[in-house]
């Protein structure tokens, strides 16, 4: 029998976008063929999909890392790189996706429901797409962007119409076994059931599922025992059925006190899906009380005595024996009617594909703050500047010049001047720090040089901080000029 795993931490990594290509078309009798480097392919996404044949999160327990494939690099002759293949991860029906802070990102209910857990990075532009009047044959291309990488928490909440609640050894597993064809483990000791058991029950034209939730004890809502793990599985149940052991010999226990204790735990528990399950709060769910083990004479007398008091709360009461199968028929009909009424009031939604929307590409806002670690330095933050930094190959002067032009058009250079930045000041954007120098914008009269170079970068011959310090010490006579 396979292990039942209902909570895992999954690390997902989308594919990286492929780099663009910088190439020039070469053909006989065409000395000026022009740029023909194509764009890189997009990285693959990581997608969670509900599959009817998957019933546990066991695979993710043993394989907690999932990575999609990268996009391919572009090539010459305008051959675009292939996109990375999406990674499809199959999850069971009822999987809830949360971030590491416990916020619900997606509630996957219904076969075919999808959630884009991580989006692949965009491919870099090739030099054919970067050609302009100022750069007719760019000697550079843009790098592909990294894909989204994040940690997700997957929790499985059983998708059942009726949840059977009760203390350990109340006979819940026995009831599931006689109502359906399920064969749960049954034994005469507490906590025999450690995972929810699902059974399919047919009553006339109605078919519904019953979940045997492992036994609850006082303090379960605060995590005592395995309470939180057990209570999680009742969040989707439309009907809550209290299974009461009328034959218990435990001191201080009776049907009324057991019901009160179970209701106290339900009232204290805060479901993660309270607003998203569509079923309302737990205290508003329909209730039914099942007085079990009435094949024992003393239990039958006790059940008859407490029935009026329970019915006074407005809950239907059924007296049964899972062993002798007495009273099962009216119970099955009643549960079927309650489920049928719920389904009519709550039509089943169509499976939805839930997607994480990336930040808008047209977001041109940015901020500039003084660098607390470097005197006279500045830190630039913004969606576009940080993306452009990641796309730039800094071993290519022409690519660096293109980056400078983009930042200038965005207004970063003017904003640095207004902030008091001096030539040679340290500027940090993303993970890159550099000495800032005002540059002349590239125009159509830009001096032609070799591909991959930018003459504007050669015009700066500013001495560094160490050289300035050395010059001051020479002027003061502290060092020889040749030292």
From Swiss-Prot:
Stretches assigned to the OCT domain: 358-438
Domain Obg per the UniProt entry, residue ranges: 2-159
InterPro entries: G_OBG, GTP-bd, GTP-bd_Obg/CgtA, GTP-bd_prot_GTP1/OBG_C_sf, GTP1-OBG_CS, GTP1_OBG_dom, GTP1_OBG_dom_sf, OBG_GTPase
EC identifiers of the protein: 3.6.5.-
Domain OBG-type G: 160-340
Residues at which GTP binds: 166-173, 191-195, 212-215, 292-295, 321-323
Residues annotated as binding Mg(2+): 173, 193
Alphabetically ordered keywords of this record: Cytoplasm, GTP-binding, Hydrolase, Magnesium, Metal-binding, Nucleotide-binding
Group of enzyme by EC: hydrolase
Pfam family, one: GTP1_OBG
Record's signal peptide: none
Gene3D superfamilies listed in its UniProt record: GTP-binding protein OBG, C-terminal domain (3.30.300.350), GTP1/OBG domain (2.70.210.12), P-loop containing nucleotide triphosphate hydrolases (3.40.50.300)
Biological process annotations from GO: ribosome biogenesis
General function of this protein: An essential GTPase which binds GTP, GDP and possibly (p)ppGpp with moderate affinity, with high nucleotide exchange rates and a fairly low GTP hydrolysis rate. Plays a role in control of the cell cycle, stress response, ribosome biogenesis and in those bacteria that undergo differentiation, in morphogenesis control.
Protein family (similarity comment): Belongs to the TRAFAC class OBG-HflX-like GTPase superfamily. OBG GTPase family.
Subunit composition and interactions: Monomer.
Designated name of the protein: GTPase Obg
Organism annotation: Rhodococcus erythropolis (strain PR4 / NBRC 100887)
Organismal lineage: Bacteria, Bacillati, Actinomycetota, Actinomycetes, Mycobacteriales
């Amino acid at each position: 029998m396979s292990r039942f795993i209902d909570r895992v931490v999954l690390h997902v990594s989308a594919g990286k976008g492929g780099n663009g290509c910088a190439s020039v078309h070469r053909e006989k009798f065409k000395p000026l063929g022009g740029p023909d480097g194509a764009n890189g392919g997009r990285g693959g996404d990581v997608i969670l999909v509900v599959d009817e044949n998957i019933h546990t999160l066991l695979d993710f327990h043993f394989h907690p890392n999932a990575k999609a494939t990268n996009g391919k690099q572009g090539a010459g002759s305008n051959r675009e790189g292939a996109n990375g293949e999406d990674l499809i991860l199959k999850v069971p029906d009822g999987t809830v996706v949360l971030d590491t802070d416990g916020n619900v990102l997606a509630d996957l209910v219904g076969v075919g429901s999808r959630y884009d857990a991580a989006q692949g990075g965009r491919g870099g532009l090739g030099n054919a797409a970067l050609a302009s009047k100022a750069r007719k044959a760019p000697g550079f291309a843009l790098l592909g962007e990294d894909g989204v990488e994040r940690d997700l928490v997957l929790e499985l909440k059983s998708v059942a119409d009726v949840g059977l609640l009760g203390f350990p050894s109340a006979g819940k597993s026995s009831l599931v076994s006689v109502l359906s064809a399920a064969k749960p483990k049954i034994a005469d000791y507490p906590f025999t059931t450690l995972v929810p058991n699902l059974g399919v029950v047919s009553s006339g034209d109605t078919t519904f599922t019953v979940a045997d939730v492992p036994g609850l004890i006082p303090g379960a809502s605060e995590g005592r025992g395995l309470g939180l793990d057990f209570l999680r599985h009742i969040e989707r149940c439309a009907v809550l059925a209290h299974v009461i052991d009328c034959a218990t010999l435990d001191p201080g226990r009776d049907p009324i006190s057991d019901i009160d204790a179970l209701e106290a735990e339900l009232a204290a528990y805060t479901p993660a899906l309270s607003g998203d399950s569509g079923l309302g709060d737990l205290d508003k769910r329909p209730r039914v009380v099942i007085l079990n083990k009435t094949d024992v004479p003393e239990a039958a007398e006790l059940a008859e005595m407490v029935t009026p008091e329970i019915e006074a709360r407005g809950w239907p009461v059924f007296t049964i024996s899972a062993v002798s199968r007495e009273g099962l028929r009216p119970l099955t009909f009643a549960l079927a009617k309650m489920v049928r009424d719920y389904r009519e009031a709550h039509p089943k939604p169509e499976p939805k594909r839930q997607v994480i929307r990336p930040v808008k590409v047209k977001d041109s806002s940015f901020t500039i703050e003084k660098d607390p670690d470097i005197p006279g330095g500045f830190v630039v933050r913004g969606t576009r500047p940080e993306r452009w930094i990641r796309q730039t190959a800094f071993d290519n002067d022409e690519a660096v010049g293109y980056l400078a032009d983009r930042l200038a058009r965005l207004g970063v250079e003017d904003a640095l001047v207004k902030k008091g930045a001096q030539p040679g000041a340290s500027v940090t954007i993303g993970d890159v720090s550099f000495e800032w120098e005002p540059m002349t914008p590239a125009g159509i009269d830009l001096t032609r040089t070799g591909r991959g170079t930018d003459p504007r970068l050669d015009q700066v011959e500013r001495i560094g901080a160490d050289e300035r310090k050395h010059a001051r010490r020479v002027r003061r006579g502290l060092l020889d000029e040749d030292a």
